[in-house]
């Protein structure tokens, strides 16, 4: 078994993402793969909406490293397949979306739903069951209001379920608000952040940089090398 990677926590604006968390609906502790801001250029200013942290189960490192010996951060960042493997890999993922600006649950869920349904219809994979899941997804969010500092939390299980939880104060609750059994939606939520057209390039950059270091460390340790890189000097500021 691969030991828990030694990672640092990260701060995005005023949001602190700890180095590991135990997500709602999970029995595992997951490590912080990367974190970054989500924003948009509005009238010449970059307006920041949310900070996003992506956590992964320990076994993600050997699985991702197997195909990517010696890849640079830039090569990982340019690789659609690398991020696709994070999205679809057989390990648990946890995505924390914390508000910098206020947002209503209705605004958030409608945007995510629209995007998912659009992609599924384009791929010809949209079904009645997906329609039912999307209705449930919209229902969970409809009365929620997210003030700055509050979070939307998604636990993506390799068995195909999506656990959704809300936090008003930065703590991670133990109980879930809802569990949806739909693998496509479970993957789509994380893909919307780090996929080919993901909304947070900063989170992708952070993941590529930190996972590159961790995969290098894993390769060296598996090759019996005693030279373990000092990750602190490469960590994202």
Swiss-Prot record:
Site (Important for catalytic activity): 108
The UniProt record lists the keyword Chaperone: no
Top-rank taxon: Eukaryota
Pathway: Secondary metabolite biosynthesis; flavonoid biosynthesis
Entry's EC annotation: 5.5.1.6
Broad enzyme group: isomerase
GO biological process terms, semicolon-separated: flavonoid biosynthetic process
Molecular function, one GO term: chalcone isomerase activity
Pfam families for the chain: Chalcone
Keyword Isomerase in annotation: yes
Binding positions (substrate): 50, 192
Reactions catalysed according to its record: a chalcone = a flavanone
Protein task: Catalyzes the intramolecular cyclization of bicyclic chalcones into tricyclic (S)-flavanones. Responsible for the isomerization of 4,2',4',6'-tetrahydroxychalcone (also termed chalcone) into naringenin.
UniProt record similarity statement: Belongs to the chalcone isomerase family.
Other remarks on this protein: Part of the biosynthetic pathway for all classes of flavonoids, a large class of secondary plant metabolites, many of which are brightly colored.
Name under which the protein is recorded: Chalcone--flavanone isomerase
């Amino acid at each position: 078994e691969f030991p828990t990677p030694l990672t640092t926590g990260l701060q995005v604006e005023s949001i602190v993402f700890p180095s590991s968390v135990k997500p709602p609906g999970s029995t595992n502790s997951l490590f912080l793969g990367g974190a970054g801001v989500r924003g948009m250029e509005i009238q010449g200013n970059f307006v920041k909406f949310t900070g996003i942290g992506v956590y992964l189960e320990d076994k993600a490192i050997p699985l991702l490293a197997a195909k990517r010996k010696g890849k640079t951060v830039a090569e990982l960042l340019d690789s659609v397949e690398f991020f696709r493997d994070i999205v679809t890999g057989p390990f648990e993922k946890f995505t924390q979306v914390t508000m910098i600006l206020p947002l209503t649950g209705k605004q958030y869920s409608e945007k995510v739903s629209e995007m998912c349904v659009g992609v599924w219809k384009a791929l010809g994979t949209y079904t009645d069951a997906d329609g039912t899941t999307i209705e449930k997804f919209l229902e969970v969010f409809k009365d929620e209001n997210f003030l700055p500092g509050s979070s939307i939390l998604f636990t993506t299980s390799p068995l195909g379920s999506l656990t959704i939880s809300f936090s008003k104060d930065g703590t991670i609750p133990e109980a879930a608000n809802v569990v949806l059994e739909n693998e496509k939606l479970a993957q789509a939520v994380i893909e919307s952040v780090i996929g080919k057209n993901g909304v947070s390039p900063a989170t992708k950059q952070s993941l590529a940089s930190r996972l590159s270091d961790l995969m290098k460390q894993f390769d060296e340790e598996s090759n019996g090398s005693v030279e373990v890189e000092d990750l602190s000097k490469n960590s994202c500021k």
